[in-house]
Amino acid sequence: MTTLQVEAAAVRDVSGTVYALAQPARHHNVLHLMHERGVKPDSSDWGQGFLLNNGRYVNRKQAAMVALRAGQIKNIPIENDRDYLLSEDLW
């Protein structure tokens, strides 16, 4: 059985389409890609998260738990009340 791991920064738009770029890309790189493809910004309805190695999109909080279980991070980075994952925490 393969251990779930966080593989890529991703953004899900209002229609549910997921845009992702492999590491070491960050979420701003994904947003730039979306802009290049003509996706109109509506950040209030976009979800920033990650793609897992099984292809599933998860939000930042879910990704933090996956990364912790997979040993990709040693603890959930709780600073300034942050309990979610940033790409900077991984790569």
Per-region residue spans from a language model:
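Linear-motif-rich, low-complexity cytosolic tails and juxtamembrane regions
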Residues: 1-47, 52-91
